[in-house]
């Protein structure tokens, strides 16, 4: 006989007028102000540009986006959700639910790109590839192990590394195309995603550091060793994944520099020193320029608006206005 679910004696409503950590409100407001949906980005304007890519470049782009979809799916349905039980404040819980929702929006946004630019057969082949690619599946499995484990700090480390590091082998390509005036509307949407992930990685890293403050020196060292070992493991796999994708177009070494750069940023979010020296983090200036808030379509990273992000405006009309 299955035991009945044990219910708590009472449920406490979240009170946004009593804040324990101001960072919760700050990040919540940032995420809400940054809210966007893929349907508002005119991706169809990229069809002509898409047709200028070679079949190999189109396949690479689809595989990159399918890999990003897998990570967003993992983060939206498992990663962010796994952080909720360990939240210190109800407002922290609310932020994690926001993060989980936006990860699902990100995952859906790639399907919007596919349905606009690709055939059903091409889409199915790309998703089949994501299941069969060993390195892609391996990085998902590595992170999943810690999401389902019983150590709250290690979950936050794994989540921060995914948000601030693992996505970036994929984010490189749309920025590369954008720097060459290709797929600029798609790149605009990817910038919106990158803006979200930057906030996610920062916030989860912040909560990790707050939790670490309560631990003993021995425990802190254990977590630091774990963090660098996990990053090494993920990096080694990511290099193989990058080679598998980018060798055919000769971009592997540039992408690796981008990985080094973002690995250091992930460690910074966790409060640790960089792992890679500056000599191997000299990212192509064109990529950094494409990442900037005023790149290409002039998106405003902080308001969620931009020339490619379209929101309808209401205009007062009279009956006579509809007589054509």
Task: Label each PLM-derived region with a short phrase.
Residues 1-324:
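Non-heme di-metal
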């Amino acid at each position: 006989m299955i035991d009945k679910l044990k219910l708590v004696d009472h449920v406490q409503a979240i009170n946004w007028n009593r804040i324990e950590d101001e960072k919760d409100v700050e990040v919540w407001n940032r995420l809400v102000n940054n809210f966007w949906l893929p349907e508002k980005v005119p991706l169809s304007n990229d069809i002509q540009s898409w047709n200028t890519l070679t079949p190999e470049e189109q396949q690479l782009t689809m595989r990159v986006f399918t890999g990003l979809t897998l990570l967003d799916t993992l983060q939206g349905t498992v990663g962010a959700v796994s952080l909720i039980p360990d939240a210190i404040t109800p407002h922290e819980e609310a932020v994690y639910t926001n993060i989980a929702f936006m990860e699902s929006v990100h995952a859906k946004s790639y399907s919007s790109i596919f349905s606009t630019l690709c055939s059903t057969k091409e889409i199915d082949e790309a998703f089949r590839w994501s299941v069969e690619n060993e390195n892609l599946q391996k990085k998902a499995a590595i992170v999943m192990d810690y999401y389902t484990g019983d150590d709250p700090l290690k979950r936050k480390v794994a989540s921060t590394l995914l948000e601030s590091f693992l996505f970036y082998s994929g984010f490189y390509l749309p920025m590369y195309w954008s720097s060459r005036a290709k797929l600029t509307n798609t790149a605009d949407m990817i910038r919106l995603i990158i803006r979200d992930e930057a906030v996610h990685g920062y916030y989860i890293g912040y909560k990790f550091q707050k939790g670490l403050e309560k631990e003993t020196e021995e425990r802190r060292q254990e977590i630091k060793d774990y963090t660098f070992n996990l990053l090494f493991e993920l990096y080694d796999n990511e290099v193989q994944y990058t080679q598998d994708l980018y060798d055919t177009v000769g971009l592997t070494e540039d992408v690796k520099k981008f990985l080094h750069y973002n690995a250091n940023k992930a460690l910074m979010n966790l409060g640790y020193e960089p792992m890679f020296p500056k000599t191997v983090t000299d990212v192509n200036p064109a990529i950094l320029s494409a990442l900037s808030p005023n790149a290409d379509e002039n998106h405003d990273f902080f308001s969620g608006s931009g020339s490619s992000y379209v929101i309808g405006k209401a205009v007062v009309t009279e009956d006579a206005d509809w007589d054509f």
